[in-house]
């Protein structure tokens, strides 16, 4: 009987810790679609993002960054594109569990070669931050919620 109570209490304690951590460790998702190359300089990369709800907090900062790299002879063509939004500007995507599609334009680094049709590597990351608006003016105070996601190198075809 004593063993059953101890196991039950330990199980409930683990469940309570899991539920408490679940409120702060949100899962955000990000997927990269098939990119489109224009004029060998711009690559439009479609991304799909899902941000989980943040309760009564206010989302104040969001960012999606996409990197493209491609072998170009003995050099590497590369570029980075970023979408960013900060309160009070409109957000990039809602944090309500719904899926949102966005396009990130990546420009080739002018110090290197241009992109070309063929295989390339795309990686991406995203973040969303939420907090409680400060009662003393601008800014946000605790509690905070931050969701991060990374997409490791994915091979795609530019064309």
Which stretches of residues belong to each language-model region?
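Hydrophobic beta-strand positions in extracellular immunoglobulin-like domains
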Residues: 48-51, 68, 106-108, 126-128
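Short proline/glycine- and polar residue-rich coil/turn motifs
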Residues: 39, 84-100
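Secretory targeting and sorting signals
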Residues: 1-27
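Short glycine/proline/serine/threonine-rich loop/turn segments at secondary-structure transition edges
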Residues: 108-122
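Short, surface-exposed binding/anchoring microloops in extracellular/periplasmic proteins
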Residues: 28-75
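Surface-exposed loop/edge segments in extracytoplasmic proteins
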Residues: 72-85
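Aromatic sugar-binding surface patches on proteins
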Residues: 43, 94-111
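Short beta-strand elements
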Residues: 131-159
């Amino acid at each position: 009987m004593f063993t059953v109570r101890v196991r039950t209490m330990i199980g409930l304690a683990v469940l309570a810790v899991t539920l408490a951590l679940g409120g702060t460790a949100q899962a955000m998702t990000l997927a990269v679609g098939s990119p489109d190359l224009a004029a060998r300089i711009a690559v439009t990369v479609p991304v799909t993002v899902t941000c989980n709800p943040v309760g009564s907090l206010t989302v104040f900062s969001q960012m999606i960054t996409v990197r493209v790299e491609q072998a170009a002879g003995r050099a590497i063509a590369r570029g980075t594109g970023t979408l960013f939004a900060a309160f009070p500007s409109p957000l990039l995507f809602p944090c309500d569990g719904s899926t949102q599609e966005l396009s990130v334009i990546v420009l080739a680094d002018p110090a290197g070669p241009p992109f070309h049709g063929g295989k390339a590597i795309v990686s991406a990351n995203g973040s969303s931050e939420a907090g409680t608006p400060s009662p003393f003016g601008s800014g946000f105070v605790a509690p905070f919620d931050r969701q991060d996601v990374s997409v490791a190198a994915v091979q795609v075809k530019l064309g």
